[in-house]
Curated annotation (Swiss-Prot):
It comes from Thermosynechococcus vestitus (strain NIES-2133 / IAM M-273 / BP-1). Belongs to the HY2 family. GO terms for biological process: phytochromobilin biosynthetic process. It holds the Pfam family Fe_bilin_red. The gene is pcyA. This is Phycocyanobilin:ferredoxin oxidoreductase.
């Protein structure tokens, strides 16, 4: 049984939605993670910590990563990032849900540019979406300059806002899958590689994620997981 069956209902629904959209657009092939990092169990302050990774590849993406994690009965996490092949100047799709004790405390989604600004087709499509208002927006972390103006970071209030957020992720993801299939190779792959490296290096600064992993598995393991599973930088 997948870990998601035990997680917050919104995380279950989002995981299913992401995989359904991927399957609708791409011929998914497995992406090989280190054998010991695909499914991981540990202890965090006496509670069981479980991490389950789902990883695929499909042109023009070198890696499609969906991570589910659970700490005891108190914390549920969904983390998703799509890593384009560096020869395409495509944004980084990323979303995260963090919940515990029946509530979602943090929800974020973005299409983050890697070469300064989003491609014009993305800006046009995202501007065409109906504007949404959420009652509790959250402040981006200090390294949040990597995100686009279309980033949504909130604490959803009630089921209606949870559904709105889920649907908006579906819209962002569908747009991304559609537009990515029209991408042509860039003349400046080194700029894309540099942008993806910057994105990954900034995300690796996420202290909350790092602290949880270090407490459960130790500093060397956490560093390896952060840099090989969560945010591996593309080769030069």
């Amino acid at each position: 049984m997948s870990l998601r069956q035990h997680q917050h209902p919104l995380i279950q629904r989002l995981a299913d939605r992401i995989e359904a959209i991927w399957q609708a657009f791409f011929p998914l092939a497995p992406y090989a993670l280190p054998e010991d990092l695909g499914y991981v169990e540990g202890k965090l302050e006496g509670e069981r910590l479980t991490i389950e990774n789902h990883c695929y590849q499909a042109p023009p993406f070198r890696k499609l990563h969906l991570e589910l994690a659970r700490v005891g009965e108190s914390l549920d996490i969904l983390h998703c990032v799509m890593f384009p092949e560096p020869r395409y100047d495509l944004p980084m799709f990323g979303c995260d849900l963090v919940g515990g004790r029946g509530q979602i405390s943090a929800a974020i989604v973005d299409l983050s540019p890697v070469t300064g600004q989003l491609p014009a087709a993305y800006t046009c499509a995202l501007n065409a979406l109906p504007k949404l208002t959420f009652r509790q927006p959250r402040e981006l972390p200090p390294w949040g300059h990597i995100f686009s103006p279309f980033c949504i970071f909130i604490r959803p209030q009630g089921e209606a806002e949870e559904q709105q957020f889920l649907d908006r992720i579906g819209e962002y993801l569908t747009l991304h899958c559609q537009l990515s299939q029209q991408a042509v190779p860039t003349d400046h792959p080194q700029a894309v590689i540099a942008g993806q490296r910057q994105y990954c290096q900034q995300q690796q600064q996420n202290d909350k994620t790092r602290r949880v992993l270090e407490k459960a598995f130790g500093v060397p393991w956490a560093e390896r997981y952060m840099t090989t599973v969560l945010f591996d930088v593309p080769p030069v």
